[in-house]
Amino acid sequence: MDPIRACVFDAYGTLLDVNTAVMKHAHDIGGCAEELSSLWRQRQLEYSWTRTLMGRYADFWQLTTEALDFALESFGLLERTDLKNRLLDAYHELSAYPDAVGTLGALKAAGFTTAILSNGNNEMLRGALRAGNLTEALDQCISVDEIKIYKPDPRVYQFACDRLDVRPSEVCFVSSNAWDIGGAGAFGFNTVRINRINKPQEYSFAPQRHQLSSLSELPQLLLRLTQ
């Protein structure tokens, strides 16, 4: 096994809590807030996959907006333009998970290159990383917008290798999303799934190498693997 040189993270759902945009305005949304947040996320991801399959790329902000429109209409809230605008503003400033900053800092201190590989475009990522105080803890922020293909297409993971000048076997890829872990594992990355709520394992043809319940466990795992 090659030594791990780079720790590459998914952003949305892994370092950044995608539910905080809706939860920030839950009192205005009412009892459907959790369902709306879940549907928004589901459609956002679905649109990224279908557009990649169709060869009809649009940036992640457009997909995020279109997915929110669908979710709001599904709950009879599409006419609430003020609510839509506030939710989109909140998505630009998603909260980071509490252990994200400390984990990234510990990895950098241990000598690992830290990077994000995200479907988000650069403008989205800059705002969210700044709001979450993550900018200084990352060596690189890699957006699929540069190649206009979404994860989990293998070309995206190769793009990260090219940007970081590493082989797949030298990458530890970290994500909370099973589909992303499956794609990264099939490509050849060493994968770690952050499974905060103990969801069942998926994509058995490319299972995660390791599973953790929090980001804070990651530095110790990597130090153990590199000894």
Curated annotation (Swiss-Prot):
Its EC number is 3.8.1.2. The active site is at D10 (nucleophile). SUPFAM superfamilies: HAD-like. An (S)-2-haloacid binds at A11, Y12, R41, S118, N119. Residues 175-180 are annotated as: Important for catalytic activity. The keyword Hydrolase applies. It is an enzyme of class 3 (hydrolase). Catalyzes the hydrolytic dehalogenation of small (S)-2-haloalkanoic acids to yield the corresponding (R)-2-hydroxyalkanoic acids. Active with 2-halogenated carboxylic acids and converts only the S-isomer (or L-isomer) of 2-chloropropionic acid with inversion of configuration to produce R-lactate (or D-isomer). Belongs to the HAD-like hydrolase superfamily. S-2-haloalkanoic acid dehalogenase family. This is (S)-2-haloacid dehalogenase 1. It comes from Pseudomonas sp. (strain CBS-3).
